[in-house]
Every structure is written in C-alpha cells, then in structure tokens.
C-alpha cells in the first residue's frame, strides 16, 4: 500500500511537471551572462511559475531570421505535446527586407517581396503576420499551445508620456485573435509600469540604450508579464494556473482597462 501511494504521488509530480514553457523572442527577453550589465525578462520567468522555462530567445532576431537561422526548428525539436510556447517578437522585424536580412514586411497580410540577401541568396520575404501564423501552426502541429505576447516597450518618451502604441504589438494581437490563440498584452503592462516611474527613474533601467534593460529592469518586465497573464481581458490564460505564490504576490502594475 505504501509503495502504491509513493508510486502514485511520484506519477502525479511527473505529470504536473511534464509540460514546460519555451520562449521565442529577441534580446529584450534573452538570457545574458552573469557579468553583463544587461538582462532579458525571460531570465526570471521561471521564478514566478511552477513550470520549467526554456528561454530560447536570441539577440537580434526577428520572426524571419529566427526561422531562417534554424533557431525555430531547434525550438520545435525541443517542444513536446502539452508544452506552452511563448512568442514575443517585433523589435527586429521593422526595416526594409531589401537591405536587411532580418526585416519583414509590415502588416499581417499575404504580401511578399523577393529580395537578394547579403549572402547573395534569393529569398521570398513575407509579412510579420505571415511568420507569426507559421509559428502558430508549427506549435499546434506539435500538440503544444502557442501564446502570442506583445513586445515590451522601448524607453521612448514625449515629455512625461511614455510611448504606448507599438505597431508590431498591435499586429501580433490581430494575428492572435484571427488565429484563435491566446494573446498576452505584455506591452500594455510594461508601458504602465515604466510610465508610473516617470522618465528619469525609467531611464535608470536602460543603461546602454532605450531598448535593453539591466537586471532590475528585466525583473520588472517579467513581473509585468505575470500581471498581464493574471489580468488577461478575454478569458483566463493557460499560464494562470501555473503562477506560483511568488508570482501571485506581484501587485504592480495594477489591472489595466481592457
């Protein structure tokens, strides 16, 4: 009897921990070395969840380059049934595909442009939305759950107002809605938190430029992601059940209007 109880309990633990979270993103999310002044918000996510987090975000990548460089295939090879894949992209998708190997076409349509890359190869480049839809489809094909997340804001101020509208975040939201998958409005909660600090204090979290945070700033962006999950407007996030007591203790930024 004792053996049966121990076996059953162990089985429950394995079952509960079987699913994991994988992250596809860029330098705002990626892990940095211990001696680096910068850090990405994905580094801290496991501190607030009861799931293992595999942060596969890579510096400088867009949806297009993440796929083209084989990083997406590597992520998929590590993705199992019932896993959760968070996709937060957009910072590096902006630009002209004719001159940048990472830029995508703006928007979410089916437009394409044929370009010659810096390696001399011919490539058909799609819209940001097209690449997101591909990622969504690939994750679903693995029996896993894709979650689209709005990108964290840059530290751009006009007087005392932090920029809150980011076209690629809006595009990501539109793709998620049209695809019937979950969207986490990380952008809104990141903006709300840094707006509450004002421009001078907010700048202290961006030591090198207006995009990349230090370690404290990264933790704040993780906490704003957790708040966005907890306060999701349209239904309950699949991640909600996995927020641990540390995550549940986060109170700022407060719930934002839907």
Please place each PLM-identified region on the residue numbering:
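Fungal secretory targeting signals
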Residues: 1-19
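Short, well-ordered coil/turn elements that cap or connect secondary structure elements
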Residues: 13-16, 48-50, 141, 178
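Serine-esterase "nucleophile elbow" of acetyl-processing enzymes
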Residues: 16-59, 73-85, 103-108
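Short histidine/acidic/glycine/proline-rich micro-motifs that form metal-
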Residues: 29-30, 60-62, 153-156
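Short, solvent-exposed loop/turn segments at secondary-structure boundaries
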Residues: 33-36, 66-67, 158-163
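N-terminal post-signal-peptidase region of extra-cytosolic proteins
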Residues: 62-74
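Alpha-helical cap/lid subdomain in secreted, periplasmic
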Residues: 74-215, 219, 226-238
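Charge-patterned, long linear interaction tracts outside catalytic cores
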Residues: 225-258
């Amino acid at each position: 009897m004792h053996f049966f109880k121990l076996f059953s309990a162990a089985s429950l633990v394995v079952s509960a921990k079987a699913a994991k979270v994988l992250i596809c993103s860029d330098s705002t999310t990626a892990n940095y070395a211990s001696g680096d002044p910068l850090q990405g918000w994905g580094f801290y996510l496991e501190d607030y969840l009861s799931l293992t987090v595999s942060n596969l975000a890579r510096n400088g990548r867009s949806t297009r380059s993440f796929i083209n460089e084989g990083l997406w295939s590597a992520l998929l090879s590590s993705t199992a049934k019932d896993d959760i894949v968070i996709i937060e992209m957009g910072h590096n998708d902006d630009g002209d595909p004719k001159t940048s190997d990472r830029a995508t076409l703006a928007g979410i349509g089916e437009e394409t442009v044929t370009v010659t890359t810096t390696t001399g190869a011919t490539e058909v480049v799609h819209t940001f939305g097209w690449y997101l839809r591909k990622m969504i489809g690939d994750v679903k094909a693995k029996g896993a759950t894709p979650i689209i997340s709005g990108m964290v804001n840059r530290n751009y101020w006009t007087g005392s107002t932090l920029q809150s509208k980011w076209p690629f975040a809006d595009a990501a939201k539109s793709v998620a809605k049209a695809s019937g998958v979950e969207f986490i409005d990380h952008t809104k909660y990141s903006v709300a938190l840094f707006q509450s600090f004002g421009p001078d204090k907010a700048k202290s979290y961006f030591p090198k430029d207006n995009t990349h945070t230090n370690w404290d700033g990264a933790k704040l962006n993780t906490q704003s992601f957790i708040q966005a999950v907890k306060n999701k407007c349209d239904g309950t996030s699949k991640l909600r059940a996995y927020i641990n007591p540390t995550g549940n203790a986060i109170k700022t930024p407060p719930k934002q209007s839907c």
